[in-house]
């Protein structure tokens, strides 16, 4: 039984009605309410079968009272009638009804038009395609409907207006949550079955709430009950925002999704009421709430504006429908709408769609050149560039790109930030289309934050080209590929000219995008390609492109290696750039290299500076404001230094470098705000009232920078300035956002967590005329790239970036073309902290770009190392100003009495007009600003910096903490034992209740710190299990202060959890080499623990350590056949593999740099980690990735054969048991690289296998082999017998444990392999070798005259597994 429906009468309802007719009647704009003359009728153009006047009732604001009423004329959607109570409203007493629809089950096949909107001959106008007609489905009538209309069951709403006319609007969308018949041709043969399925679906359909957008109070409401006194604006599933309706709670309570209404009431109405009734709430807070609500309402109105028409289609009735993309919504929210309705709303978008469908600039209509035409300079701005007037230097940039294209060369557009690189690039693409008939497709890859700016530039400067923004989720991108890429579903002819996308979607959809041949590739912020080993670099390098352009304002950021990567991407193999130039000790040869490089690069890099080409741009000045730390900051700073004393005074190799870097990051956080550490804010608020004033005071007074910022913003606000605040740390932006709210400052925010659509709204809102926004909070990396915020004239760098170029990019957001005011930049700096030294070192980096790009290097130029900070530099940074932290100060008093004028008067002024690159002439003045006095912090010792009493205090705290932990764990252990004992006696009452157990478990979990687990995990995957290498792992993980029992427990639990995860997912077969995703688990709150790595590598490393037990790893050689390497740029054999294993055992898996630098291993010239990669031919192997693969393979061999090592001695004459038999008596030859020639050996009989095994059993009659007793005594005296006993004992053990899982070796397996090695190393004579091998065999009771060999071949492919390799020789014992 269906619920009742009531008609909603619009005659007396106060609504903004859009009355539109296609024959020239008046049109009321749905947004602004102004009446204008409508455009001419589209009936003749679209060749509709029926012309009709349409009227639509649309909401002009979020508070519009318009209703949408469902019609039943020839439709397939069953309108679920809902019993609706009367609304006791003075203005309207009619019933309110809910309208819900489902998406179309018809295929979304676009009908493409090949005609233009204007001046088209009648015979050229194609008739829209019609679907094959189907029998009309059975109609269901709504019960208790006043007019007893037959509601449309296909996919329509009927909007009844006051005049009685009706507009039919398609309600299909692109999402398929119901049955969807995607291929119409397939189902044409099964119409009867389709009708039956549709009818079944229709009977089950009911309206579903998608979102609750807004609420309003009823005029006749007597109280504030959210369920009886309010109406709610509902967005329905599968339809656009055009069909949003206002509904009562009682009406919605019977609709699917009504819980969303309850959630909305809690999160909005009740929360809003609590805020307004709170006595501590200020007027500014209420104003902020109202502004935010209004902003959301404006955004909802944006969702009703047509942004683009994607496709068109003709339904069964001959009516045209448009697939519409709505403004600010992604492609997965596109819906099918009636063409006449859309034309009345957005005639310009319809015109643009028809123009695109029959564009003269379709890619397949372009011209193909066998040879590039000669270059002709553009003397003035072409007529087809109509977006505005380009400047002379921009026209020069277009000519430069055109010159490179005619020569079939690529380049780097490296103009300083703010000079319009985006406009130049877009105009050049327009030049290719209009002047050279190169219609694309063109690919533009940009950062996500710059997408809105690029979209705006493309729409403004190239409106006649078809540009697509390829972003969004998987469904959105699928819609783009289906409707926007090709002219038809069966055609591979592209219909777009420009595709705009981001780095992330290049990686996600590289398969689809790489199938297209691109005429031009432009990459914005191209310094993302500075790492030639990154996935983005490799993916874009494989794209098929005719020409490429890199766009970056900072072509050099750190070192020459990054420049080499960019140049190699553009011109593979054409340039070789040395990245090891030392600027500290320049010489004549290096100067010649630099000048030669500059001359060679000059034609391919175009760089102009603002001061040289844009004289009208206002100036920019930078001031460094130094401020003291607060008392809370000082205390945290000292504690971090003191508690990390071991790391500060420990090793300064690669492992220590990471620890020091972590300390530097922690100190940078302290320099910003102590609230960045968990629990700091709560600790300060203890004993204080949780009032608004106390919260605000804590945020300000506990950070010196916040005190300065508070005073500075008050003055800037008073003087009418607008401010951009940049910080590296997103959590710092959270604190700043809370401060802005408490102060009542209107602000916007942009960081890496903000979606693209919200970013665009925030930027537009800030740049809008008369915008109320005072501050824009931005992260340095996400907000410092490519966006235009020139409506602000003040920039505050709250904390400096490691890379000075990132800060310059941030400043350029305001200092760019279009800026009308002088730009002030304030850089905050905490005194006597690591920030000061980092800033000074960062400044020196910029000389590198100055030298290469602008002036070249002279003997007077100075520069520090351009590589990343090493351990010594990090140690010097940490020591800078550290001693002042332990001196008594009155910083807090200074902060409370801070005088802003005094701070500004003593600020360090820095003229930033000579930013990166310096002046194009005369660089001496530029170089002088980098001449800084080095602070010789390395002369100090940490014992001199940190007072002894501080060390004693910290050590006492650590001892107390360790004792407390041990006591807690002992108590828990006893309770656990009691619980286990209690389980044996069910009648005994437990002393602990379930609640107490839960609390105890919570306390245990709280004690497990994430840092400890991560450090332990990293150490274990380097060295193995804690049980075997406790001291090494504890030292590596820096857990000396942690209770050993705790370390053992964590290690065992981690291994157990990983084993269970691998076994649970069916990945416990270690021999399976098929590619699969990593098994990542969460262990005690720590995520991304690789279970397979722990299960395999950690245990393999333990096997390796056990194999070396009692032996000198440097004197061991692999005595087992292993596969050889291929295409490595060095001689690599068994000796190198043996040393690699020894290095892994000594330094840890993955520590390739330490292994390379170890002189005892002799691998310095065989491992290539830092070699330049200018082209494929010069890439040296092995690199780190090859060593990882080789190391894992060798560890798997150790796992299979733990006795594979044999002793290597320096005196061959003493190795009587290691000589190789002459070639005549043995056809096997083993070389140092591991390759083995064919050999012959008779198969071993089953009986003799059992005899050998039985001999092993006799060694240990109890069933276990006492390997220590058997092997220890004769290890050095009689090596052959030791080997025999070891292997036979192992065979006996394997027989009892894994009898059929592993093949064992006899003594001769090892002896033959050793003999093969010795023959190659010592070049023994065949006769001498044969005698000694015969002697060894006779001692072991083996036959000398019967070699017993069989054919044996080893695979040497890279994917060969250990299990594929047969044993070397299996002789009879």
Swiss-Prot record:
UniProt region (Disordered), positions on chain: 1-110, 123-159, 955-1004, 1210-1373
Entry GO terms, CC: CENP-A containing chromatin; chromatin; condensed chromosome, centromeric region; nucleus
Biased composition (Basic and acidic residues): 1-12, 86-102, 965-987, 1248-1258, 1325-1340
Main location: nucleus
Pfam families hit by this protein: Chromo, Helicase_C, HTH_CHD1_Hrp3, SNF2-rel_dom
UniProt-annotated location(s): Nucleus
Enzyme Commission code(s) on record: 3.6.4.-
UniProt feature, compositional bias: Low complexity: 51-84
Biased composition (Acidic residues): 1348-1358
Residues that bear Phosphothreonine: 1259, 1264
Function statement: Seems to play a role in mitotic chromosome segregation and maintenance of chromatin structure. Has ATPase activity.
UniProt family annotation: Belongs to the SNF2/RAD54 helicase family.
Entry protein name: Chromodomain helicase hrp1
Gene coding for it: hrp1
């Amino acid at each position: 039984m269906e619920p009742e429906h009531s008609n909603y009468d619009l005659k007396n309802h106060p609504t903004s009605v859009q009355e539109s007719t296609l024959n020239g009647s008046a049109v009321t704009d749905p947004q602004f309410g102004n009446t204008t003359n409508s455009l001419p009728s589209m009936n003749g153009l679209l060749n509709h079968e029926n012309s009709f006047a349409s009227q639509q009732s649309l909401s002009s604001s979020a508070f519009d009272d318009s209703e949408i009423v469902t019609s039943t004329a020839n439709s397939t959607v069953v309108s679920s009638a809902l019993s609706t109570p009367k609304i006791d409203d003075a203005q309207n007493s009619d019933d309110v009804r809910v309208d819900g629809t489902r998406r179309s089950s018809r295929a979304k096949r676009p009908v493409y038009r090949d005609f233009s909107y204007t001046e088209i001959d009648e015979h050229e106008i194609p008739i829209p395609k019609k679907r094959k007609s189907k029998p009309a489905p059975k109609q269901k009538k709504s019960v208790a409907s006043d007019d007893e209309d037959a509601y449309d069951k296909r996919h329509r709403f009927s909007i009844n207006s006051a005049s009685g006319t009706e507009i039919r609007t398609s309600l299909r969308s692109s999402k398929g949550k119901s049955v969807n018949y995607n291929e119409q041709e397939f189902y044409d043969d099964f119409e009867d079955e389709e009708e039956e399925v549709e009818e079944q679906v229709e009977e089950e359909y009911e309206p579903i709430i998608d979102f609750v957008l807004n609420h309003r109070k009823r005029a006749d409401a007597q109280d504030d009950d959210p369920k009886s006194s309010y109406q709610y604006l509902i967005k329905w599933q599968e339809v656009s925002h055009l069909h949003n309706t206002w509904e009562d709670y009682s009406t919605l309570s019977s609709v699917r999704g009504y819980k969303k209404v309850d959630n909305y009431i809690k999160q909005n109405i009740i929360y809003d009421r609590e805020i307004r009734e709170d006595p501590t709430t200020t007027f500014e807070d209420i104003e902020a709430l109202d502004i935010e609500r209004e902003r959301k309402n404006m955004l909802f109105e944006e969702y009703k504006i047509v942004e683009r028409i994607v496709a068109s289609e003709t339904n069964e009735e001959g009516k045209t429908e448009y697939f519409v993309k709505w403004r600010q919504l992604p492609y997965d929210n596109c819906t099918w709408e009636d063409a006449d309705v859309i034309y009345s709303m957005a005639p310009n978008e319809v015109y643009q769609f028809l123009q695109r469908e029959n564009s003269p600039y379709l890619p397949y209509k372009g011209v193909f050149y066998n040879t590039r035409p000669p270059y002709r300079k553009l003397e003035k701005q072409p007529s087809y560039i109509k977006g505005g007037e380009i400047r002379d230097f921009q026209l020069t940039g277009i000519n430069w790109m055109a010159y490179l294209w005619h020569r079939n060369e690529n380049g780097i557009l490296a103009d300083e930030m703010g000079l319009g690189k985006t406009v130049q690039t877009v105009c050049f693409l327009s030049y290719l289309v209009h002047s050279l008939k190169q219609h694309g497709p063109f690919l533009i890859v940009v950062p996500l934050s710059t997408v809105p700016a690029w979209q705006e530039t493309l729409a403004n400067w190239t409106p006649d080209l078809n540009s697509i923004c390829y972003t969004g989720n998987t469904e959105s991108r699928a819609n783009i590929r289906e409707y926007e890429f090709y002219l038809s579903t069966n055609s591979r002819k592209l219909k777009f000219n420009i595709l705009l996308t981001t780095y992330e979607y290049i990686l996600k959809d590289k398969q689809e995008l790489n199938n297209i041949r691109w005429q031009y590739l432009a990459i914005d912020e191209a310094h993302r390609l500075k790492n030639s080993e990154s996935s983005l670099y490799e993916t874009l390098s494989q794209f098929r492109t005719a020409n490429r352009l890199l766009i970056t304002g900072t072509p050099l950021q750190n070192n020459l290696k990054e420049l080499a990567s960019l140049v190699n991407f553009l011109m593979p193999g054409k340039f070789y750039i040395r990245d090891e130039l030392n600027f500290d000790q320049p010489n004549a040869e290096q100067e010649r290299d630099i000048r030669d490089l500059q001359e060679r690069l000059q034609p391919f890099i175009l760089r102009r500076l603002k001061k040289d080409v844009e004289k009208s741009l206002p100036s920019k000045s930078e001031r460094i404001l130094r401020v003291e730390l607060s008392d809370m900051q000082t205390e945290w700073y000292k504690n971090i230094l003191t508690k990390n004393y071991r790391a500060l005074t420990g090793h300064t190799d690669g492992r220590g470098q990471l620890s020091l870097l972590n300390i530097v990051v922690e100190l940078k956080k302290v320099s910003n705000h102590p609230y960045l550490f968990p629990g700091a804010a709560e600790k300060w608020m203890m004993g204080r009232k949780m009032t608004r004033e106390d919260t605000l005071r804590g945020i300000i007074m506990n950070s010196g920078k916040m005190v300065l910022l508070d005073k500075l913003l008050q003055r800037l606000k008073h003087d009418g300035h607008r401010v951009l605040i940049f910080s590296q740390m997103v959590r710092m932006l959270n604190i700043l956002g809370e401060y802005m709210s408490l102060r009542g400052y209107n602000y916007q925010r942009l960081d890496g967590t903000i979606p693209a659509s919200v970013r665009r709204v925030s930027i537009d809102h800030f740049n809008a005329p008369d915008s109320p926004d005072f501050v824009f909070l931005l992260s340095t990396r996400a907000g410092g790239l490519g966006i235009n915020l020139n409506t602000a004239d003040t920039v505050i760098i709250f904390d400096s970036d490691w890379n000075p170029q990132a800060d310059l990019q941030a400043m350029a957001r305001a200092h760019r073309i279009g800026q009308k005011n002088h730009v002030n930049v304030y850089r905050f700096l905490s005194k006597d902290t690591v920030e000061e030294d980092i800033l000074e070192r960062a400044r020196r980096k910029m000389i590198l770009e100055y030298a290469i790009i602008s002036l070249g290097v002279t003997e007077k130029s100075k520069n520090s190392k351009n590589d990343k900070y090493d351990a010594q530099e990090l140690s010097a940074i940490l020591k800078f100003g550290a001693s002042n932290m332990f001196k008594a100060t009155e910083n807090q008093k200074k902060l409370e009495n801070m005088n802003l004028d005094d701070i500004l008067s003593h600020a360090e002024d820095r003229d930033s007009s000579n930013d990166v690159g310096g002046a194009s002439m005369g660089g001496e003045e530029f170089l002088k600003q980098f001449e800084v006095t080095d602070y010789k912090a390395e002369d100090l010792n940490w014992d001199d910096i940190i007072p002894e009493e501080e060390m004693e205090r910290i050590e006492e705290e650590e001892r107390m903490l360790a004792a407390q932990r041990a006591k807690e764990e002992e108590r828990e252990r006893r309770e656990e034992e009691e619980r286990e004992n209690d389980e044996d006696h069910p009648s005994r009452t437990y002393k602990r209740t379930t609640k107490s157990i839960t609390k105890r478990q919570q306390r245990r979990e709280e004690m497990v710190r994430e840092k400890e687990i991560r450090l332990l995990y990293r150490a274990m995957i380097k060295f193995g299990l804690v049980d075997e290498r406790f001291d090494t792992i504890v030292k590596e993980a820096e857990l000396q202060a942690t209770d050993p029992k705790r370390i053992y427990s964590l290690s065992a639990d981690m291994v157990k959890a990983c084993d269970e995860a691998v076994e649970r997912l069916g990945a416990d077969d270690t021999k399976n080499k098929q590619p699969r995703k990593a098994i990542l688990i969460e262990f005690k709150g720590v995520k991304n623990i690789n279970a397979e790595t722990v299960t395999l590598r950690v245990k393999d490393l333990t096997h390796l350590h056990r194999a070396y037990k009692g032996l000198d790893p440097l004197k061991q050689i692999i005595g087992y056949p292993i596969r050889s390497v291929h295409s490595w740029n060095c001689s690599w054999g068994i000796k190198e593999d043996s040393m690699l294993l020894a290095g892994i055992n000594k330094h840890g898996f993955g520590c390739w740099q330490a292994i390379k630098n170890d002189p005892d291993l002799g691998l310095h010239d065989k491992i290539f980690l830092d070699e330049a990669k200018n082209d494929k031919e010069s890439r040296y192997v092995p690199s780190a990735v090859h060593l990882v693969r080789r190391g894992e393979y060798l560890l798997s061999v150790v796992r299979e054969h733990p006795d594979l090592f044999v002793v290597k001695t320096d005196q061959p004459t003493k190795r009587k048991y290691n000589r190789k038999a002459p070639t005549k008596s043995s056809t096997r030859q083993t070389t140092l690289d591991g390759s083995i020639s064919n050999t012959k050996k008779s198969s071993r009989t089953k009986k003799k296998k059992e005899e050998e095994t039985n001999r092993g059993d006799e060694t240990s009659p109890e069933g276990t082999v006492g390997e220590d007793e058997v092997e220890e005594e004769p290890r050095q005296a009689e090596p052959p017998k030791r080997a025999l006993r070891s292997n036979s004992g192992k065979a006996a053990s394997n027989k009892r444990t894994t009898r059929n899982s592993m093949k064992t070796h006899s003594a001769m397996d090892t002896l033959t392999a050793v003999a093969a090695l010795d023959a190659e190393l010592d070049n023994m004579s065949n006769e001498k070798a044969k005698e000694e091998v015969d002697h060894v065999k006779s001692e072991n009771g083996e036959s000398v005259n019967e070699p017993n060999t069989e054919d044996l071949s080893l695979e040497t492919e890279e994917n060969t597994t250990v299990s594929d390799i047969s044993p070397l020789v299996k002789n009879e014992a």
